[in-house]
Amino acid sequence: MSQQDLTSDMLTRIRNAVRNHSANVTCLNNKLNRGVAQVLTDEGFIEGFDVVDDGRQGRIDVHLRYGERGECVINSITRESKPARRIYMKVDELPRPLGGLGIVIVSTSSGVMSDRLCREKNVGGEVVATVA
């Protein structure tokens, strides 16, 4: 089956795994998905991820993070920029989800990074997703 938007598919799989209280979720591998997983790891929303080579495209195993009472750290994860409607923002236009408690994942010319890192490096780009 052909997937058109692998990043939307990855975010939907993570959202469904959070609802089912799954420990791990498997997603298809590409450069943007690896970047999104790295940002989620760096910001503490997931435990980590493993890139598995299966002889074809490969896959990413994402390990979700849960709190002491069993609640997932990710409350919401939303795809912002879509293939039919790309959203680009300058660094001063980037929103602060939940007053700074959430993050915006941005694809820049310097790689995929969070809105906090974009403000430090003073770069804007395509808004990929919002995580809270």
Describe each region flagged by the PLM:
Residues 1-132:
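Core subunits and conserved enzymes of cellular information-processing
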